[in-house]
Amino acid sequence: MRKVPGPITLIEPLSGNTSLLIKINAIHSVKKSPYQEIIIADTEDYGRVLILDDYIQSSYVDEQYYHESLVHPAMATHPNPRDVLILGGGEGATLREALKHGTVKRAVMVDIDRDVVELSRAYLPQMHQGAFDDPRAKVVIQDGFVYVEEAIKAGDKYDVIIMDLTDPYSSDIAKQLYTREFFAKIRRILNDDGVVVTQAGNSFYFPAEYDMVLEGVKANFPIVAEYEVWIPSFGYAVNFILGSLRYDPHALTPSEVDERLRARGVKTAFYTGRVHLALMNMPIHRKLR
């Protein structure tokens, strides 16, 4: 770890015109991978953070808002999720949350960047909490697009697919995984009652990109849910889009969600049945013109 010899400020862009200033106290690792710049640092307000190409991906003090909201609505919507695929999520927290469900027999995490996974394993233990070593988990270092195409050819199927990728507007790495055509491929590797969920960036600052993702999901799934959660270290509300082939997340009552979590042995810090109800009934923020 390198102590910062003076005040260093991360300038995190929220849009082309607005930025968030974050004080950094110490830097643990800086590495330029073949795909992106990776920084792991300690911040004043958000604790340890993973930064990819100037964007905070996760922070110790608020990552549960993000990861629990990404994972559990989809997992709770499915009555018996056994096989789970995660695209992205290199710090291991999405894998951690999925593995909390006692129904899960197999969880495959596919990330294109080996360096993110290895640095997260070394410097972000609070994120993964040993999930990489769970016997039900398999970590694959591969382009998610290629993995899905190979899964189609192999006839591999999943109950829940969780897309924890970089934003559709922040870099070129994941853009092809947000298209209508890719969601058609996702549908082909889901079981007949499967569920997919993706983070979709921010609808306020990037409405066109958000709409692209939303239309891609709507074109391929009969049941669609939009929801969002404020993430302090991001400086904005993160949007999520859930697509389902059979089960409607809007139909779940708080007591049904809580009972599914209890039966599966899931312990959460943020997500509950009442939170699920709130997520499914909140407005999506856009600029009011």
Curated annotation (Swiss-Prot):
**Locate the PABS domain: which residues?**
5-245
One of its GO biological process terms is: spermidine biosynthetic process
UniProt-annotated catalytic positions = 164 (proton acceptor)
Q: Which source organism? A: Pyrobaculum calidifontis (strain DSM 21063 / JCM 11548 / VA1)
The record lists the catalysed reaction(s) as:
S-adenosyl 3-(methylsulfanyl)propylamine + putrescine = S-methyl-5'-thioadenosine + spermidine + H(+)
Sites where the protein binds spermidine: 67, 91
GO MF terms held by the record: spermidine synthase activity; thermospermine synthase activity
Task: Give any Pfam family that matches.
Answer: Spermine_synth
Q: What is its EC number?
A: 2.5.1.16
User: A single GO CC term, please?
Assistant: cytoplasm
Record PANTHER family: THERMOSPERMINE SYNTHASE ACAULIS5
- Report the subcellular localization: Cytoplasm
The record's section on Gene3D superfamilies has: Spermidine synthase, tetramerisation domain, Vaccinia Virus protein VP39
Annotated binding of S-methyl-5'-thioadenosine, by residue: 36, 111, 143-144
Tell me what this protein is called.
Answer: Polyamine aminopropyltransferase
